[in-house]
């Protein structure tokens, strides 16, 4: 039995024909592909018109996508500064103007709403305008106070109503609310704090602490008084008697016949009694120079010192003036000796 090799061309002529046909088809497909792409690009270019801004944007994107530099070196990836062109500057300027216009309109609307809220809130003044935060706080308190009235079902007291309105508000706003509701601000402060607004204590008590001396005791017949009001009876003419043998004619009246009352004090730096509203210190200095030859009975300047009540604290100016008087007496004594 004879056998022929499989590779000979005589045996399988059809297979060679198929092979040639397949190769020709593949070559034709490769040639047709670039032609079809070029036709599609031409057709799209005719039908679609590009805007100048879009062209510049696409060109910039293409430039950004390039990974190689002009020299062929790889570029650094990341944020790069874009080229400042006229179109880009105009776009940035237009966006900024739009943002400013939106913010301006928003603020105008907010201010109009706050003005309408100020007309409703119980606080009106022709000269003073509430701030934004004070208006919102007062509106919140007003809504809460009205809701409490509806919940209780009774008409509240005016004082409590104002107290509820003024929670967390500043002092000028509180005064405006009290004036709008025809309520005295002083009485409102007294009611709100639960204690009197005016105190009998001196404003200088924080700077000058009280001095307690064993010599200053409660006068007879006045044991029920507090320690803050206690005062030892003292003859204010002792300074006059220390320089002269006889007593002063002005001190002929008995000492403290009526109830005790501390002398009025002017806190402007001047200690004055009821008879004297102002003191001329230049005359006191001349008076000391004129009568300095008379020797005092006690130590130098002892009679010139005043004994003060325990609760009366005087400013620093008064202490300086009393010290200046004693120093003047010492200088006079030195010059005459």
From Swiss-Prot:
SUPFAM superfamilies: HLH, helix-loop-helix DNA-binding domain. Residues 54-71 have a biased composition (Acidic residues). A motif (Nuclear localization signal) lies at residues 80-86. GO terms for cellular component: nucleus. It is found in: Nucleus. Residues 43-82 are annotated as: Disordered. Residues 94-146 form the bHLH domain. It holds the Pfam family Neuro_bHLH. One of its GO terms (molecular function) is DNA-binding transcription factor activity, RNA polymerase II-specific. Keywords: Activator, Developmental protein, Differentiation, DNA-binding, Neurogenesis, Nucleus, Transcription, Transcription regulation. One of its GO terms (biological process) is axon development. It comes from the Eukaryota. Activates E box-dependent transcription in collaboration with TCF3/E47. May be a trans-acting factor involved in the development and maintenance of the mammalian nervous system. Transactivates the promoter of its own gene. Efficient DNA binding requires dimerization with another bHLH protein. This is Neurogenic differentiation factor 6. It comes from Bos taurus. The gene is NEUROD6.
């Amino acid at each position: 039995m004879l056998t022929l090799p499989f590779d000979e061309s005589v045996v399988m002529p059809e297979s060679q024909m198929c092979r040639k046909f397949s190769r020709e088809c593949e070559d034709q497909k490769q040639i047709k592909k670039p032609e079809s792409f070029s036709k599609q690009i031409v057709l799209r270019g005719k039908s679609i018109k590009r805007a100048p801004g879009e062209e510049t944007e696409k060109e910039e994107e293409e430039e950004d996508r390039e990974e190689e530099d002009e020299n062929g070196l790889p570029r650094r990836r990341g944020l790069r500064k874009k080229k400042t062109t006229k179109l880009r500057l105009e776009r940035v300027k237009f966006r900024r103007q739009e943002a400013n216009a939106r913010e301006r309109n928003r603020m105008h609307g907010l201010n109009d709403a706050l003005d309408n809220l100020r007309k409703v809130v119980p606080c009106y003044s022709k000269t003073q305008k509430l701030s934004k935060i004070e208006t919102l706080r007062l509106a919140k308190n007003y809504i809460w106070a009205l809701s409490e009235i509806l919940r209780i079902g009774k008409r509240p007291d005016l004082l409590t109503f104002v107290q509820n309105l003024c929670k967390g508000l500043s002092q000028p706003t509180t005064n405006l609310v009290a004036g709008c509701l025809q309520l005295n601000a002083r009485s409102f402060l007294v009611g709100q704090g639960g204690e009197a607004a005016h105190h009998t204590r001196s404003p200088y008590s924080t700077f000058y602490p009280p001095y307690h001396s064993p010599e200053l005791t409660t006068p007879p017949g006045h044991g029920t008084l507090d320690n803050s009001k206690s005062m030892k009876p003292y003859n204010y003419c002792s300074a006059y008697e220390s320089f002269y043998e006889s007593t002063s004619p002005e001190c002929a009246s008995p000492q403290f016949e009526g109830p005790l009352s501390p002398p009025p004090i002017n806190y402007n730096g001047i200690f004055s009694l009821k008879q004297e509203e102002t003191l001329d210190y230049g005359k006191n200095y001349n008076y000391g120079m004129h009568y300095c030859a008379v020797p005092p009975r006690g130590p130098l300047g002892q009679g010139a010192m005043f004994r003060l009540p325990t609760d009366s604290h005087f400013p620093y100016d008064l202490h300086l003036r009393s010290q200046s008087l004693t120093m003047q007496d010492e200088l006079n004594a030195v010059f005459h000796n």
